[in-house]
Amino acid sequence: MRTGRVTQTIWNRSVKKQIQKGNRNSIGKAAWEESSSELVSDDKDFVWSSASVSGKAPAQVKYAVIKAAGDLAAKRVRPTAVSVQILFLESSDEQELKDIMRILTEICEETGLAITCVQAESAEYVLRPVIQITAVGVKENPKQQTKKWIPGTEIILCGYTGLEGTLRLVDEAEADLRTRFTPSFIEKTKRCKEALILPEQVLQLTEEAKSRQCGDGGVLCGLWELAEAEKIGFEIDFSKLALKQETVEICEFFQLNPYLLTSAGSYLVLTEHGEETLESLKNAGFPAVRIGFVKEQNARTLVNGEETRYLDRPAPDELSRWWKERKESEEQEDRRGDNYVKHCTL
């Protein structure tokens, strides 16, 4: 299989067919584009969502929390708690766990989440630490109805394309970035984390609006998922997809496509009252821009000046590609080093 998330085709063929026979208590739609699950009991509707990250920097954990909790908030579910599972390399030490827990505690305090369970272990098959977060909440309005969006419904981007991935690249490869960029640029980029949209902020959206968090695969994957989930076609003004200049420059440095870069903390919003929604978002201090509208047909088109093209199926996330290429580069360096040692000993 390709690097990163399995394709929609594989998921439908190998996952969906297997689980359709059960799930009698679940009213959530089991679909590739869905990032949360719902279980109905006699008293309450429980909803949960999971997100995983991998990387050497302890700060990665906060992005998993933002993603998992944000997916609940996008469904108008207030996240209340998280459980955590961490896989370490066998060579890891206790300080790495302490660093992750410190950052986890900070982000959970900031977002009002309880930490209910933490499991950590090391294994010989782990190449870099993997953190999985499961967030849970209770649906406050279990009678929410699926809405059919009419042509002309506006699509708003709240947040910045590829910002999460940009921040994670700084965490993982600051030494590399310092070969090109000044310390002030690096510090300014780190402060961009304040532009990430948090779950509590998403819950402030008006009742009629529908939101969906971008994530793995970037804003283009988010648009595809939105179309799949809401059964809509649309026209998107590609030039309106907001990017931080720091994202542009860092993606250029690593030769990455920012529109395919993981974007947790940014949301796509459907609304029939675009002007009011934009005004309320901006008044609350959230970066937001109108990027397109729903069309009567199912076509998903991207317009960039005079060029119009159809939205492609989601591609692998650029951060996953970066990690893969980095690993291959390190392996090549190791082989060159081994060959040099062998040559010197002959």
What are these regions (language model features)?
Residues 1-346:
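Helix-biased detector of long, well-ordered alpha-helical tracts
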